[in-house]
Amino acid sequence: MRYLLCTLMAIFFFAPVTYADNGIISIKSSHDVKTTVDRLENILREKGMTVFIRINHAEGAQKVGKKLRPTELIIFGNPKVGTPLMQCGQSVGIDLPQKALIWQDEAGQVWLSYNDPKYLASRHSIKECVEIIKKIEKVLGNFARVATMP
């Protein structure tokens, strides 16, 4: 049990995360795109989130004769979380429901990317509701870690 706890803590604290200046958090995945999206979709449903749609951008590109590395978008949310956030700043609704982009870069590395909740708060001038933003940060980070870890 102690070993498991230490392992989980190491994954949590040392997970490869990249913060971009544009408000996107990207986490390296240990899996291919499809597996990462499948894992994310499963954890979202297990935790009571609504998965609205899963979009395979590479398939869309192929339909018009274009090539695109594996890239999928999953759109999900829960009004229990989204509504209070919109009550703090209704314009944040343009960025809701939440989205996660799972994509493969030119080197073959798979990433799971999502909007940084702090960035959304700043973008929509949400100065209150700090606890809601913290909760969303924690939940999204947990979902991403579960989907991407070995």
Residue ranges and their predicted role:
Residues 6-15:
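Bacterial N-terminal signal peptides
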Residues 118-150:
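C-terminal partner/receptor-binding element of secreted or periplasmic proteins
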